[in-house]
Curated annotation (Swiss-Prot):
Underlying gene: SSU72L3
Enzyme class at the top of the EC tree: hydrolase
A molecular function (GO) term: RNA polymerase II CTD heptapeptide repeat phosphatase activity
InterPro entries registered for this protein in UniProt: Ptyr_pPase_sf, RNA_pol_II_suA
Name by which UniProt lists this protein: RNA polymerase II subunit A C-terminal domain phosphatase SSU72 like protein 3
CC annotations in GO: mRNA cleavage and polyadenylation specificity factor complex
Pfam families: Ssu72
Reported function: Protein phosphatase that catalyzes the dephosphorylation of the C-terminal domain of RNA polymerase II. Plays a role in RNA processing and termination.
Keyword Nucleus: yes
GO terms under biological process: mRNA processing; termination of RNA polymerase II transcription
Organism field: Homo sapiens
Principal location listed in the UniProt entry: nucleus
Amino acid sequence: MLSSPLRVAVVCVSNVNRSMEAHSILRRKGLSVRSFGTESHVRLPGPRPNRPVVYDFATTYKQMYNDLLRKDRERYTRNGILHILGRNERIKPGPERFQECTDSFDVIFTCEESVYDTVVEDLCSREQQTFQPVHVINMDIQDTLEDATLGAFLICEICQCLQQSDDIEDNLEELLLQMEEKAGKSFLHTVCFY
């Protein structure tokens, strides 16, 4: 068993659906977790597929909620966005960008390959100070309510196994292989250093 709590980050594009669903579930299980996005702005489904509603990362979830409520309560209730923003507001005030975080983590989960690439690139561009390893793991999770929940439970299962592990370094590869077989998904994994 690890001597200190596992420090986990979950990262998606906008820090609204996938990373926040995992944040919610991991937090309920008592894990030390933070969540982030990587894009320059938060993009939510708009009135048409090619017209997203765009917010700055400094916009709180409550401000987004109230704005969408005012714009089209029925649409954003029907597509689940108001529910998601309400959940998010109960977890933290607003979205955060990974590139602006200076905290260290043991494991960072990303929800799509482009986010994985951004996180790894960002970590590799930072000046190494402590040489503490961080495992970056990508599992592709579609940006839907159902897939976000399924992905969050898989992330939670991996975290719980790692929390019980004596040595992350020795056990992670084998654990990921078992989870790939169980979930029918393949994961990307690399180690970076702080």
